[in-house]
Amino acid sequence: MTFLIPRKYFYLFVVLTLSYNQPRFCLNTIWNSNAMTFINRSFLDTAPRDIFVNSNNSIYFPHRRTGEIHMWQNDNHLNSTKTISGSLSDPYSIFVTTNGDIYVDNGQYNGRVDKWIVENETWISVMNVTSPCFGLFIDIYENLYCSMFYNHRVDKKWSNGTTTIVAGTGVQGSQSDMLNHPWGIFVDINLDLYVADSGNNRIQLFRLNQRNG
């Protein structure tokens, strides 16, 4: 006689929260050709370098001269609804996660990337850099990416604390494994990295664990 023993299967589900926290648009979205001034020159004071808009249409802007982060909510362009002060000097880029934590470049004079933790409203240093990050990004595993315009590469700070180069060689060039003044970056849910390779007039796609774009 044969006895069939039922097998038991256990499934582990890991829920990953998308970090980009940015608006989603339809494929046929169009914009009004007549623009309005959201922030005027008297407030900016110096040329702006980056801006972040989250999924709730809140707008974050790092002020280069004051080192403050200004936030606008509900399209209130007359006055910022929140100002966050920190020891920032000439910040180049900003990234805001879905829970409201803010990552800001502080590499020009202080050699680091700083994080403002929304839960307790405190600043911490999360990454050491050798030059400013012209682009910042946090992937779905909370790894931090920094595009180094002057060093011609993209560094990745893993959640375990290790930092590695994931794109570029550190030398300016146009070959498939090289970058020339990288700027904006984006990491999709497959952990593929897109780089605005500004000096080469191209967008480079680096697949996960691939150094050739």
What is the meaning of each model-derived region?
Residues 5-19:
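Cleavable N-terminal signal peptides of Sec/SRP-targeted secreted and luminal proteins
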Residues 58-60, 101-104, 143-146, 192-195:
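Conserved beta-propeller blade signature
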Residues 67-70, 110-114, 152-155, 163, ...:
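Structural signal for beta-propeller blades
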Residues 53-56, 96-99, 138-141, 187-190:
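Residue-level detector of Asp-centered blade-edge/turn motifs that repeat once per structural unit
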Residues 56, 64-65, 107-108, 149, ...:
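Short loop/turn segments immediately following the C-termini of beta-strands
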Residues 20-47, 76-92, 103, 120-132, ...:
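Gly/Pro-rich loop segments of beta-rich domains
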Residues 61-83:
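Beta-propeller domains
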Residues 18-20, 39-67:
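Beta-strand-rich domains and repeat architectures in extracellular enzymes and scaffolds
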